[in-house]
A protein has these predicted regions:
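C-terminal functional regions that serve as terminal interaction/effector modules
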Residues: 80-88, 93-95, 99-180
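Mixed-charge (acidic/basic) macromolecular-recognition segments
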Residues: 1-54, 159, 170-180
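Alpha-helix initiation/capping motif
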Residues: 16, 43-44, 59-60, 117, ...
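Long, positively charged binding patches that form subdomain-scale interaction surfaces
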Residues: 38-103, 107-108
Length: 180
């Protein structure tokens, strides 16, 4: 077994922003995003910075806490992806109990527990990826070194549009640097 180091993306200034934006808008499935990144030698965050704000917009880092509490209050089902290079855990369902404690944001559900140290969130992005069923909207969280911490989506079934409630909850988040 031979291990290979992860490919290092090129600096974003070498990428063609118009081409990346055009390719993003042409997607018909969220999974095509991985191919877009590979084709243009980009990290997720580099791609986010290259496209229009309607596709990727940086939001304040308190977005996770706000979104989880709103989803809990409304009871709509969400998906939370947390992973690393070797493993991904996916939660799908309604968030039942959110407990902030000593800098940690905790979710306590009967079948899912998450403990996230809020100060480790360096960047938070709302992204919209086109699919054959309309846009799929997510909140993506990153550490200072660019490592992805988590992705959140409204629960949806392939072939169905995104929850309008989820979209409204995401749209309520404040873009970074703008007053609420």
């Amino acid at each position: 077994l031979e291990l290979k180091a992860a490919e290092t993306p090129l600096p974003a200034e070498k990428a063609d922003a118009a081409l990346v934006d055009k390719a993003w808008r042409a997607m018909t499935d969220v999974h095509q995003f991985f191919g877009l990144l590979k084709l243009h030698y980009l990290s997720r965050q580099q791609a986010f910075r290259l496209v229009g704000d309607d596709l990727a917009c940086q939001v304040e880092n308190n977005a996770l806490a706000l979104l989880l509490e709103t989803a809990r209050q409304h009871g709509n089902e969400i998906m939370i992806f947390v992973g690393n290079r070797g493993c991904v855990q996916i939660f799908t369902g309604a968030v039942e109990k959110v407990v902030p404690m000593k800098g940690w944001l905790n979710i306590f559900n009967p079948t899912f527990t998450l403990h996230l140290l809020e100060e480790t969130i360096a960047e938070s992005w709302v992204t919209r990826k086109p699919t054959a069923d309309g846009h799929v909207t997510s909140l993506e969280l990153f550490a200072a070194d660019g490592t992805q911490i988590a992705q959140l989506y409204g629960q949806r079934t392939e072939g169905e549009p995104e929850q309008s409630q989820w979209r409204s909850q995401i749209d309520a988040l404040t873009p970074k640097g703008l007053a609420a």
